[in-house]
């Protein structure tokens, strides 16, 4: 593209052109360009900015002049008139393109027509100056802390400072208002803090106005993946081991209650979404979230989202969770428990509904303190309804790369009648030196030996069969990784096949692919 060549001529040192940034993973020194699409290229540099960040420079086609854009907008408004725009975003884009094609035929422009169309659609339909970051699949998070540069977290290079910059409050406020309106949750001075979803599904938090955000309005975007990360990808990334995944598979087969816990940005929702593929296919699932992130492969899936109106029409997680109990679900999945809906979740467990959720807690002690304290206030006698607590964290490896690891999986057994403490057993622990998940092995799982064995009618002499089954499930998942079966829905299909054929036959089948 000519605009990329124009950019390159202004550089003192020509960067390397690469197809995939992953080839530079672990590199301390880099200067490269990669393509996002025909109109967006990214130049990444290890040259530190004054605030210590590596550089992320967006390369886009030049914009038409301000006067040209004003004229185009006026003509567009006249052309579209009172036409009702289509609901579907892609159909809207088609309509805009067809109108612009006619308008631009009769205009003399300072830039090529396709550049004008790109910028018009980028600004009017999508996310404006942030759109290149939304389109880049290697970005995890986007942060506008106020006036100044936009920052990102890159999947390969970690935190970076972008070339996108806001220099006045009006420009920044206009973006925040525009994006919140496109998210159908508009900000205002009466409602300055809003959680919403962008048109592509990414989760966004808006804080509007200099009166509450001293450096100007701010936003944080957590990028959304259209196809969820699969359990085999998490095994390949090292987030969890195949044995740990096999253990979770076994537990979800038996309707166990499970929380995925960790700090912010530790990958809790990603893991929760990945393990939903282990829930038996013939069960009814209800997902309850503030912003829609969970994607469940099951056909009998009810997806519910809260509604914030600031008045009587507000629907909170608490309301949806109470309603879900009347919908006869087999599994209830809550995007994140943080308030009194946690109490309802434990009542659901008490009445025989299986529940999974994410939760902010770094360890079992913090988990219990938060669950039993204000505002959740779960009675301690209810805590053992939660069978499994999985703890995940984000950390840096020896090369300085950001990685995510499940560092402990605890089985919650009971409440000690003397000390009133929660009794639990760590089923898996993490060895940070070897970067390995350690399974305590045969005889170590209370849930396998005292719940699953009893449920299946297996006597204590034959409990070893359940551990053998764990090994087979682990082997099956390892084979999927070896065969590079990573697509979320493909993995789901192979798990269904294993259910139909039996594990032994499924292992033979995958081995011969």
Curated annotation (Swiss-Prot):
InterPro entries: P-loop_NTPase, T2SS/T4SS_dom, T4SS_GSP_E_ATPase. It is found in: Archaeal flagellum; Cell membrane. Its cofactor is Mn(2+); Ca(2+); Mg(2+). The keyword Cell inner membrane does not apply. Changing residue 284 to E: Does not affect ATPase activity. Shows a reduced ability to form hexamers upon ATP binding. One of its GO terms (cellular component) is archaeal-type flagellum. Optimum pH is 6.5 for ATP hydrolysis. Keywords: Archaeal flagellum, Archaeal flagellum biogenesis, ATP-binding, Cell membrane, Hydrolase, Magnesium, Membrane, Metal-binding, Nucleotide-binding. Mg(2+) binds at residue 269. Changing residue 336 to A: Retains very low ATPase activity. Cannot restore archaellum assembly or swimming in a deletion mutant. Does not affect ATP binding. Forms a stable oligomer after ATP binding. Shows a reduced ability to form hexamers upon ATP binding. Changing residue 76 to E: Significantly reduces localization to the membrane. CDD domains: VirB11-like_ATPase. It catalyses: ATP + H2O = ADP + phosphate + H(+). Archaeal, but not bacterial, lipids stimulate the ATPase activity 3-4-fold. Its EC number is 3.6.4.-. Disruption phenotype: The deletion mutant lacks flagella and is non-motile. Induction: Part of the fla operon, which encodes the seven fla genes essential for crenarchaeal flagellum assembly and function. Expression is induced by tryptone starvation. GO terms for molecular function: ATP binding; ATP hydrolysis activity; metal ion binding. It is a peripheral membrane protein. Belongs to the GSP E family. The S.acidocaldarius archaellum assembly machinery and its filament consist of seven proteins (FlaB, FlaF, FlaG, FlaH, FlaI, FlaJ and FlaX). FlaI forms hexameric rings in the presence of ATP. Interacts directly with the FlaX ring and FlaH. Component of the archaellum. FlaX, FlaH and FlaI form the core cytoplasmic motor complex of the crenarchaeal archaellum. FlaI shows ATPase activity, which provides the energy for both archaellum assembly and rotation. Hydrolyzes ATP with the highest rate, but is also able to hydrolyze GTP, CTP and UTP. Cannot hydrolyze ADP into AMP. This is Archaeal flagellar ATPase motor FlaI. The gene is flaI.
């Amino acid at each position: 593209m000519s605009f990329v060549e124009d950019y390159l001529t202004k550089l003192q040192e020509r960067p390397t052109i690469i197809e995939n940034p992953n080839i530079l993973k672990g590199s301390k020194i880099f200067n490269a360009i990669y393509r996002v699409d025909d109109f967006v290229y990214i130049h990444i540099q290890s040259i530190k900015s004054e605030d210590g960040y590596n550089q992320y420079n967006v390369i886009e086609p030049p914009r038409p002049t301000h006067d040209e854009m004003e004229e185009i907008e006026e003509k567009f408004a006249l052309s579209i008139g009172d036409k009702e725009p289509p609901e579907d975003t892609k159909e809207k884009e088609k309509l805009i393109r067809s109108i612009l094609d006619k308008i631009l035929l009769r205009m003399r422009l300072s830039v090529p027509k396709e550049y004008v169309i790109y910028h018009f659609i980028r600004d009017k339909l999508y996310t404006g100056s942030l759109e290149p970051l939304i389109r880049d699949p290697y970005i995890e998070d986007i942060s506008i802390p106020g006036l100044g540069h936009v920052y990102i977290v890159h999947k390969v290079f970690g935190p970076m400072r972008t070339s996108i910059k806001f220099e006045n409050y009006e420009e920044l406020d206009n973006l925040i208002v525009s994006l919140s309106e496109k998210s159908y949750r508009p900000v205002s001075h009466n409602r300055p803090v809003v959680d919403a979803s962008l048109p592509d599904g990414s989760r966004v938090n808006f804080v509007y106005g200099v009166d509450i955000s001293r450096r100007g309005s701010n936003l944080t975007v957590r990028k959304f993946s259209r196809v969820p990360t699969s359990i085999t990808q998490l095994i390949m990334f090292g987030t969890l081991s195949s044995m740990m995944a096999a253990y979770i598979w076994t537990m979800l087969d038996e309707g166990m209650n499970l929380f995925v816990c960790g700090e912010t940005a530790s990958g809790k929702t990603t893991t929760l979404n990945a393990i939903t593929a282990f829930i038996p296919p013939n069960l009814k699932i209800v997902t309850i979230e503030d912003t829609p992130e969970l994607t469940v492969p099951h056909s009998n899936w009810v997806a519910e989202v809260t509604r914030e109106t600031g008045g009587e029409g507000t629907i909170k997680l608490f309301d949806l969770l109470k309603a879900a109990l009347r919908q006869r679900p087999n599994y209830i999945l809550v995007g994140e428990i943080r308030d009194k809906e946690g109490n309802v979740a434990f009542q659901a467990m008490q009445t025989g509904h299986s529940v999974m959720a994410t939760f902010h807690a770094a360890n079992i002690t913090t988990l219990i303190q938060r669950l039993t304290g204000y505002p959740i206030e779960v009675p301690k006698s209810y805590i053992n309804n939660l069978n499994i607590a999985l703890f995940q964290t984000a950390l840096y490896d020896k090369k300085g790369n950001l990685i995510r690891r499940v560092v402990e999986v605890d089985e919650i057994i009971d409440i000690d009648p003397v000390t009133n403490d929660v009794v639990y057993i760590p089923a898996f622990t993490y060895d940070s030196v070897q970067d390995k998940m350690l399974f305590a092995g045969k005889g170590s799982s209370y849930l396998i030996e005292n719940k699953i064995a009893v449920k299946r009618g297996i006597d204590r002499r034959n409990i070893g069969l359940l551990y053998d089954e764990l090994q087979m499930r682990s082997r099956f998942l390892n084979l999927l990784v070896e065969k590079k079966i990573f697509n979320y829905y493909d993995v789901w299909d192979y798990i269904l096949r294993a259910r139909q054929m039996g594990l032994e036959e499924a292992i033979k089948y995958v081995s011969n692919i």
